[in-house]
């Protein structure tokens, strides 16, 4: 009687190390206990591929996928799934940022785009049972060639398939076999290279662990085609599980008459021995491997001697890697056409190197959500591998680079994400296929340090036989180490390139000629990082500790001494913490609430736990200062006579005014609105930024000597020439970008369509605003969420936000999204408006379409495409488009030479922020387009510095003045305190108490909580 369910437990190295055999034992015991052992079979399979999620269990025939199983999960799983027929969602895979688990294996993105040729038996058979392999057509290809094909026919089929070596060189397999057969001398040897030593690579090991018989069958077919009777598998001794299964497979094949003398009675004899290598990376090179097999030191020899003619013991020898051999039985069984129609092929010439047919196995590792082993068709793009299969970058961080081809492969940037992955295209851009390692790097990876790491690795693995490799790697390692320590000098990059070229031209083996790839590719694609290390003594990724001891401070656009103020909070010296913040930031209360905190993703603690709540601690220090009535006192410079006019009182304008005022300059700010603060005052609701906090900090700006004239519109009430005539020696434009852009759909002129500013401005000015009962907000920004949450507070019964992409791609802050959902706002993802329905010139509804993501736009995000026939109508009476804004430059004098971009922003010198009009500077959203408050403040500080130098008639130095580090003694913690530490949740006003009012939602950290959170800090500054 057949089993009704097969429970396939992954028993690859990754899952075994996570105790998958204990899970298997627990399953068998529980199944027997429940008297299900006649109905349910538990099978230990090879590697499933999704290595980071082990132990893995797949239940067939449904294909239900369970992950990260523990022994304690088993009784419940057996009862629910096997007895009651209810799969267990909590044990299923849930994609990052999503909340809905995916039950079936084939529906998980990691598996969706894979095509299994070499891994065709993955997760299906017990690798320790030859019977399982035979049941999957194992050894039928061998029988076919032995009894119905001549050796030349076998070689011809392999040639037609286009199979190229998967070990790194990519030489056409069929041509290699043919050359070896024609070498004329005997004996001939067949060798499998399983000496996989690349960092982060485990393709060959996993394939042997999962399906060793496919490799043995491929080798035996190859031996028949070549005319060999002896074969060797050269495998690392640190692969114990692969070795164990390989030994078992060879013994089983011999017992079945599939290896040894007179195989299957065919008169063909062939046997295989295992040779355990010592783990030298250079022995992955064919001639070094053969030297090691012979019992000599594993050193390569000159390539003009071909191993197919003079290889092992100077005899004709054919060497292919594990993956190449595993593909051979499939090509024989299913025909060369099956293999050749997958991938890319440039020509029909069978003797050509052109094209890359079939599939390739990659180990996908590094800064990626779904790490593991994948097999994909040649020609798939890097983007599909990294984002569709790999699930993108953890923590919402930005993709930076991917290294293909192992330690001597190239590092490719984001602009090459749409590159098809095949032998030729990778070589064209300075990388290579290699054996299939693929290491993904995010924005926190320093490309100079990456190059240094791989050069150091290769330096240690070089055999030292040839001077270019031995001395070249040593010299490059020394140069790269100096650069990462901040000791680089002009000419270092050029010297690296020169050494690299010498190695490429003259090194003895492929290790030496390819070793410069990490250096050359990072120089080619990330030259600016080398320049930053050498010229500016800065590591942009905040990795090199000699240059950037504290990533948090480095990431702060204002260069605030983060560990300094966090350290003071940890010691209970809150006034000192507030003083440190104010040294670089005139708006601690504002930024403590609405800063987008780029420092937190850089926090080193975030690599192993939650990052420090840096923004919340900033707010705590500011609130403490305000509660204690501490008035900030800033030192002012000597008075100066040159007057400065600032147009706009938003964050950029007020910041520039503050620092110019402290420098002694008379500053006047002209603001169109009746209140100061710009969009801080009229664009951000009180529940996020109370007016009391905003006004307190504006008063501190005024105290520095800044005059703010509200209700004055430049270009109408006063002109540019008036400002010049009134003696202003410099003008700073900081008018922002709040002119709404149209959706481009019909009905936008109807009553009930409101621009965000038409809603938020009167609300923030205390005026009454009426919205309908059913409101639709369009967009995925923080402003869109502000509009939705404001409409909710104004009494709208239903508020729906439409966003045309997925939740993972929504630009709004995650905390804002969750707060909106908690307040009852419905968010329709993958939805876009197509028409505003109008009746009697009023909004009567909104026609929408469902979207799907297909391809990519210029920003690198997936492009939303309407799904045909997916239209539906929302019953709404108010529509608020909040998709994008642009600056309004109508106040600028016509014909005065201001350069403007195609997107209506002002062109400025990036170093000085001076416009094309002498004496006129600009910063903030009017220059960048819609940005963050922190970015505007940073540009305001730079503008103040630039204007000050301009007024003194001096050139502004490119180097920023070095800022001091505050010496704060660390708090000593007990082991018990450390164990209890975790990031606190911000106390908030309950959702049911938010409706109908604009009370602040986030309540601030209590004193004890703030101190405890500050004590979690690793205090990276102390390692300087």
Where would I find each of the regions flagged by the language model?
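Ferredoxin-type iron-sulfur electron-transfer modules in oxidoreductases and energy-metabolism complexes
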Residues: 1-6, 18-43, 61-90, 141-158, ...
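A conserved FAD-binding loop/helix module that cradles the flavin
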Residues: 787, 923-957
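Glycine-rich dinucleotide-binding loop and its adjacent helix/turn
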Residues: 621-637, 696-716, 740-794, 900-916
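N-terminal Rossmann-like FAD-binding beta1-loop-alpha1 element of flavoenzymes
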Residues: 643-668, 784-792
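Hydrophobic alpha-helical positions that pack around
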Residues: 114, 243-378
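FAD-site-proximal beta/loop scaffold in flavoenzymes
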Residues: 749-773, 856-930, 934-935, 971-975
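Rossmann-like dinucleotide-binding cores of NAD(P)H-dependent redox enzymes
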Residues: 666-708, 763, 788-835, 955-970
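Feature captures the FAD/FMN-dependent oxidoreductase FAD-binding
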Residues: 643-647, 695-745, 835-847, 854-855, ...
